Amino acid sequence: MDKLRIAAYGGFRWIPPKAGAAGSDKFAFELYPRIVKRGHTLVAYCRIYPGDTDFQISEFEGITLKYYKTHSKAGLDTLVHSAQATFDVIFNNTADVVHLHSGANSIWVILLRMAGKKVVLSQFAMDWKREKWPWYGKLFYKVSNYITAYLPNKVAFDNVYTKEYFEKKFRRTYNFIPYGSEVKIPPSNIDILNKIGLQKDEYFLFVGRFIPDKGLHLLVEAFEKLKTDKKLVLIGGSPNPSEYEMKIKKTTDNRIIFPGYVYGDDTNILIQNAFSYIQPSLIEGLSPIILTVMALGTPLICSDIIENIFITKSNAIHFVSGDINSLNEKLRYALNNKEAILSKAKIGKTDVSERFNWENITDQYIDLLKK
């Protein structure tokens, strides 16, 4: 099988990413155009949420885009959408090989394999540990692990720790393929800084979803205790209406600002001009935003979970995960040791560019999809 016919769905919501997008969207945005450029065909199944009025394009950089309506409730949206995509693949024969995202979608492997489709599943993290899921959601993930472990033709993990967990529990061998770190160097204009009212090096930054896993409640409280004139800029929001987001935005500290969603070059410009980027995650897979921050050479403060340590090594400032006082201490350290954090960032930029290369990652995925 030289040229592949591939269908992809399950984790990403849209290609290209838009408001509410997450790491899986970035992953698909970087990987799939590269696969198509190597001569393969790929159908990506995107989501339409209630009230979504955006114009739906049918093609992006050679990728065929198909759309299905889904539910707005977190978790249920993936289930409903993936069911429709699965039946389209089977009954309309849109692909020979299916690339599924997330073990939550492993239930569809059964039908796909029965229909003669090859399935490669990408597992990004220990999702059953995420605080955003109720007990029944966590139970669903734990049960799905057994299907993930045995039924796909191949399974790829983006971090070695989840891979090791599965290998130890299920006594099987799996594949490790990380995210890439390359980013387009943003233009030198600072229009986005002017729009938000920022100056270079005068703000800390976070970009991502406002969900408990990301630890924003810890960051807000730690920053509120910090004596500085610098601002804390929290870019993003919740993919669905969220009490957690409302709680975060109740802060009375006027140094903390919420510009909403920002994408593309503007995001990278904000990262590149920040005094430091902060990633307070309680749980992660291999974090795309950390890779982006390090590739741009911006000083990084992040939680000491093993997935973050794997990427950053000693090239970031680490605080004890879940510990507000530890985070506050590291914020104070950064303010008083600018040259030290810049030195770490410079070394980290070189390191991630060598270890996390999108072209090599694309080659690995194509090899896996062909097996």
Residue ranges of each PLM-predicted region?
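Membrane-proximal helix-turn-helix segments that form the acceptor-binding/catalytic region
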Residues: L31, F87, M114, K138-V155
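Conserved acidic donor-binding segment of nucleotide-sugar-dependent glycosyltransferases
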Residues: I317-N325, Y333-E339
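A conserved mid-protein helix/loop that constitutes part of the nucleotide-sugar donor-binding site
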Residues: K26, F206, I211-K225
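Nucleotide-activated donor-binding/catalytic signature segment of Leloir-type glycosyltransferases, i.e.
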Residues: E245-D265
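Short hydrophobic beta-strand element within catalytic cores of glycosyltransferases
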Residues: P299-C302
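Glycosyltransferase donor-sugar binding loop
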Residues: R47-P50, S181, V207, K231-M246, ...
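An aromatic- and histidine-rich active-site surface loop
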Residues: D77-F91, A95-F124, W128
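Aromatic "clamp/platform" in nucleotide-sugar-dependent glycosyltransferases that forms part
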Residues: L282
